[in-house]
């Protein structure tokens, strides 16, 4: 998985008094965090959880569906990025199923938080670690949440033998390395905006909801990624407007110099003789 277990790495931590469940708490949440205040739980990137956290299937479904919606509206590669989200959900399930937990440093990398932004997370992890273990495994039923599924992808049965694998160069989970965000920007693939397919004539009206769609590389009807194209057009328009304004200001400045020079060379009012007969 993402991180090796303490036993594999040879690390050891003393258990905290009364921490009969979590014997490696310092590896997971560090030192005991101080009491949380209103600012910690309401502002900043780390204000997404509080101690006493429980699994709410309805909230989980709505949150994941919201991310699917963001992908459908803004991604240039809807199918590929939807698979990324599904892999994330599966990997976190497997971490719990195989009893592997991220270290605090691993949490910071996964959630992209600074050490000063992990107060709520650390307090929540510490509280959960001191809960008594559940007696037996349980199952979560699908909640009855009335929402429109945003992952609008079709099942193509006759794909002509096309490769259905990802083309993003994904690496196996056991060799994943955390990289700087600046290094990620060098990969131009994430900034590809796919054009609408001219061959796709199917209507895209899932569940009676009309909307534009295009057929992606996997042959699936997905919402047309128009937002990135609009963003590019707005950026180009802003760049053109900025260039035009700069050019106008430059011309105005040059014209102002000529105007001052002409005004200086022009005859004064008292030097101009009055008209004849005045």
Swiss-Prot record:
Describe the PTM: Phosphorylated in vitro by host and by protein kinase ORF47.
List compositional bias (Acidic residues) regions by residue number.
155-169, 183-205
* Localization annotation: Host cytoplasm; Host nucleus; Virion tegument
Q: Which InterPro entries match?
A: IE68 (IPR003403)
Record's GO cellular component terms = host cell cytoplasm; host cell nucleus; viral tegument
Q: Residues annotated as region IE62-binding?
A: 1-142
Keyword Transcription regulation listed? The answer is yes
Keyword vocabulary terms for this entry: Early protein, Eukaryotic host gene expression shutoff by virus, Eukaryotic host transcription shutoff by virus, Host cytoplasm, Host gene expression shutoff by virus, Host nucleus, Host-virus interaction, Inhibition of eukaryotic host transcription initiation by virus, Inhibition of host RNA polymerase II by virus, Transcription, Transcription regulation, Virion, Virion tegument
Chain segments annotated as transmembrane:
none
What Pfam families does this protein map onto?
A: Herpes_IE68
Per the UniProt entry, the signal peptide is none
Main location, first listed in the record: host cell
In this chain, the stretch annotated as Disordered covers 1-42, 154-229
Q: Does the keyword Transmembrane helix apply?
A: no
Q: Its Gene Ontology biological processes? A: regulation of gene expression; symbiont-mediated suppression of host gene expression; symbiont-mediated suppression of host mRNA transcription via inhibition of RNA polymerase II activity; symbiont-mediated suppression of host-directed shutoff of host translation
Query: Can you tell which superkingdom this protein's organism belongs to?
Result: Viruses
Which family is this protein grouped under?
Belongs to the herpesviridae ICP22 family.
Quaternary structure and partners: Interacts with IE62; this interaction modulates the function of IE62. Interacts with several components of host pre-initiation complex including GTF2E1, GTF2H2 and POLR2A; these interactions lead to repression of gene transcription. Interacts with host ASF1A; altering its ability to bind histones.
What is this protein for, i.e. what is its function?
A: Immediate early (EI) protein that functions as a transcriptional regulator of cellular and viral mRNAs mainly by interacting with several general transcription factors thereby disorganizing the preinitiation complex at certain promoters. May additionally help to regulate levels of histones in virus-infected cells by interacting with host ASF1. By inhibiting host transcriptional program, IE63 plays a major role in the ability of VZV to overcome the innate immune response to the virus.
Protein name per UniProt: Transcriptional regulator ICP22 homolog
Taxonomic lineage: Viruses, Duplodnaviria, Heunggongvirae, Peploviricota, Herviviricetes
